[in-house]
Amino acid sequence: MQPKQRILNAPVYQPGKPIDDVKREFGLTEVIKLASNENPFGSSPKAKAAISEQLDNLALYPDGASLNLRWDLADFLGVKPSQLFFGNGSDEILLMISRAFLSEGTNAVMATQTFSQYRSNGIIEGADLIEVPLKDGVHDLEAMAAAINEQTKVVWVCNPNNPSGTIVTTSELEAFMKKTPKDVLVVLDEAYYEYVVDPEYPQTVPMLAEYPNLIILRTFSKIYGLAALRIGYGIASEELISSLEHVREPFNTGTLGQVAARAALKDQEFVKSCRDRNREGMKQFTDSFDEWGLSYYPSQTNFILVDLKMDSDEVFKKLLSQGIIVRSGNALGFPGFQRITIGTKEQNDKILSVLKEIVTGALK
């Protein structure tokens, strides 16, 4: 009994190492996880209160159309409710887009060093992948546009990019969209949208009126701090959203996630506080890296990719032994680098103290 061969060829996603595993492995009582770009400040108290009010309704199926969340989010974004599409995290939307548009004989264009699930979903659907290297850690949109051919169905653009944290600018994206054929779907994955402070970052929702072949993906897993509840969403033309509904599973988002997302959306003070504290934390890292003479990519996210010029897996293991979980650059296509989530001030102080010992050779 064997599944399809191409499924076996698809890489299995490797999440950040679980905290409990590290505690058991190293006999530690305290571990900080700075590996999965989660919000170290948690989630809005309003979201937690909304969840508690639904605990007597767990026997009931959720609203399959996410109607209340749909209306709230449409009002917040200034779009029609019919322009929204919900998934069990934006990961599921990536899967559904791939299922709807990719097949044998087609291809997708993507960056070489970007979010791994674009590649995995393409392989599963039997599509070819055209990978374009990053340019100074940024999507090379000019080269990606040139790579599009008659078999191209989807172009994946992660903005800000994971794992480099870099952005493509408004002018770069507009030039790219003008070059892209109207029958090629451009997927803008904006999972870290709310963290961005760079004024050159594109505001893409208004672009939907001009580009019906554009879909924007965002999530409640990052700055909203609801990663455990898996609520992602897409914004696109009504026609495109309608076509994706054909591949959406029934009841794919849960009641607790829907009510928490509605409450979190209404607490923009919490979002602003998290964004501000994230930039303060980012400065802790960049100031230290500058002092130590280390190179890093300018990040508009809640993580930073730094070149320690050492074996990535060895540094990863040294940090683990000290109760700190990060992501080795070897797993991300950046040997010698580590990707580090920005934590609380105390968490940042801890990892920077250990990194200094590693960089200076004090920690063997």
Curated annotation (Swiss-Prot):
Its EC number is 2.6.1.9. It catalyses: L-histidinol phosphate + 2-oxoglutarate = 3-(imidazol-4-yl)-2-oxopropyl phosphate + L-glutamate. The modification N6-(pyridoxal phosphate)lysine is found at K222. Pathway: Amino-acid biosynthesis; L-histidine biosynthesis; L-histidine from 5-phospho-alpha-D-ribose 1-diphosphate: step 7/9. Its cofactor is pyridoxal 5'-phosphate. GO terms for biological process: L-histidine biosynthetic process. It comes from the Bacteria. Pfam families: Aminotran_1_2. One of its GO terms (molecular function) is histidinol-phosphate transaminase activity. Belongs to the class-II pyridoxal-phosphate-dependent aminotransferase family. Histidinol-phosphate aminotransferase subfamily. Homodimer. This is Histidinol-phosphate aminotransferase. It comes from Brevibacillus brevis (strain 47 / JCM 6285 / NBRC 100599). The gene is hisC.
